[in-house]
């Protein structure tokens, strides 16, 4: 079974290199979510869906943070070869999430060079975060038909509550 990795916001497909290097017994692919032509969550979702819909072998979708939210959302699409999900640090509902709004405000206030030092694009991060302000995957999580492994570190305070809620909905 193939493993398909989706990275988080501010990261790249290269972020999964060490994990993929360890899992050499499994065919795998890390999808680059953003490019100069694909710079919004909606465009990413459509492009990744088109890619996954053409996948000819069974696969597990593995996502971190934004990639986990995307994986969960895509689980509600018609993907005949999708078999399971692995979600790490998945935001369930950003709509009304005070910490998320504070993060977005900080993104807007930070100078561009701070993002560039991290290899990130400020305009992209602010734009995608603005788009995600209304994200609410509660309904999708409640009907997710796939076996799902949820992963969240005990010190990941911003995501721990969300992952606990997700666990209740998926179980």
Each language-model region and where it sits:
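Short beta-strand immediately N-terminal to the catalytic nucleophile in serine-hydrolase-like folds
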Residues: 61-63, 88
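Flexible "cap/lid" loop of the alpha/beta hydrolase fold
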Residues: 76, 82-112
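Short beta-strand/loop motif that positions the catalytic acidic residue
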Residues: 143-144, 150-152
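Conserved alpha/beta-hydrolase "acid-adjacent" motif
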Residues: 157-163
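Active-site nucleophile elbow and catalytic-triad environment of alpha/beta-hydrolase enzymes
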Residues: 124-140
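Gly/Ala-rich beta-loop-alpha elbow adjacent to hydrolase catalytic centers
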Residues: 63-71
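Conserved HGGG/HGGXW glycine-rich cap/lid loop of the alpha/beta-hydrolase fold
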Residues: 1-37
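Conserved acidic catalytic loop of the alpha/beta-hydrolase fold
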Residues: 42-59
């Amino acid at each position: 079974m193939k493993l398909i990795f989706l990275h988080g916001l501010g990261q790249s497909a290269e972020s999964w290199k060490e994990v993929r290097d360890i899992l050499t017994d499994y065919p795998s692919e890390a999808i680059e979510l953003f490019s100069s032509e694909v710079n919004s969550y909606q465009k990413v979702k459509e492009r990744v869906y088109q890619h996954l819909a053409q996948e000819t072998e069974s696969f597990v979708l593995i996502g971190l943070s934004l990639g986990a939210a995307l994986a969960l959302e895509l689980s509600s699409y018609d993907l005949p070869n999708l078999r399971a999900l692995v979600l790490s640090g998945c935001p369930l509902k950003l709509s009304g999430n005070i910490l998320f709004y504070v993060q977005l405000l900080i993104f807007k206030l930070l100078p561009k060079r701070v993002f560039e030092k991290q290899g990130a694009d400020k305009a992209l991060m602010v734009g995608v975060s603005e788009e995600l302000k209304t994200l609410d995957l509660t309904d999708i999580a409640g009907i997710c038909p796939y076996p799902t492994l949820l992963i969240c570190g005990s010190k990941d305070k911003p995501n721990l509550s969300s992952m606990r809620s997700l666990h209740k909905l998926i179980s």
